[in-house]
Amino acid sequence: GLRQKVQSLV
């Protein structure tokens, strides 16, 4: 989901 995508950035 979006959460996983955001965590991928960090």
Swiss-Prot record:
<dbReference type="GO" id="GO:0005576">
    <property type="term" value="C:extracellular region"/>
</dbReference>
<protein>
    <recommendedName>
        <fullName>Toxin To64</fullName>
    </recommendedName>
</protein>
<keyword id="KW-0964">Secreted</keyword>
<keyword id="KW-0800">Toxin</keyword>
<dbReference type="GO" id="GO:0090729">
    <property type="term" value="F:toxin activity"/>
</dbReference>
